[in-house]
Amino acid sequence: AYGVQPGTGWYTPAGVIHAPASVVTYEPQWNSDVNTIMENVTMGEVNPENLLTDCQPKEEKGDVDALFAQIDWEESTRKDYKQKYIRAPKPLPETQKGLAEKWVAYANEWIAAKEVTVAPGAKVKLSDQACYCALVVQGHGKFGTFECEAPGVLRYGDISGDEFFVSESAAKKGIVVENTSSYEPLII
């Protein structure tokens, strides 16, 4: 196990056994119909067996050998795992006043994640070559025509303004993002 450093990303290939960090992290990934939770106790709570077997085909239900065959043991136990898969933040050159961008997940052909910081009072235009999901993790302002805000206390069923999907065409045109705070950065 490796300590998680805030702001640092990891690339975890499919089949590599791993666990969530003890701090809030984001794990960008592509769609998959496989999810096997092999941890039987989490923070003192016993996980039900169905979390282990739900994604097994009917003919393999309860087959422990089939469960363990899902794991890529060679990648999961490689001695240079950290060196190969850690993703230190890569700051991008400043292109607009009040905008700081850095890659936090990269170096694979399927997914990437960028942290975008808009300074207090700044208005910037974000352009990209592909569609993306934007998550507001700190601050408030405008994301295109919408109000955006990192949630403080969010209860089940509440509406929030922290998640946006940007189509490829909109990403290429650019989205205007404004931080309406006088004090706090807007971090997406």
Where are these regions (language model features)?
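Conserved metal-binding segment of the jelly-roll/cupin
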Residues: 3-21, 30, 137, 146-181
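A generic structural micro-environment signature
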Residues: 10, 34, 43-47, 124, ...
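Structural beta-strand/beta-sheet cores of well-ordered domains, especially the beta-sheet scaffolds
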Residues: 8, 16, 21-26, 109-114, ...
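Intrinsically disordered, low-complexity coil segments
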Residues: 46-61, 168-174, 180-185
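C-terminal amphipathic alpha-helical segment
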Residues: 36-131
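Glycine- and acidic-residue-biased ligand/ion/polar-headgroup-sensing regions
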Residues: 1, 22-24, 110-111, 118-157, ...
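A short hydrophobic beta-strand segment most commonly corresponding to one strand
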Residues: 21-47, 176-188
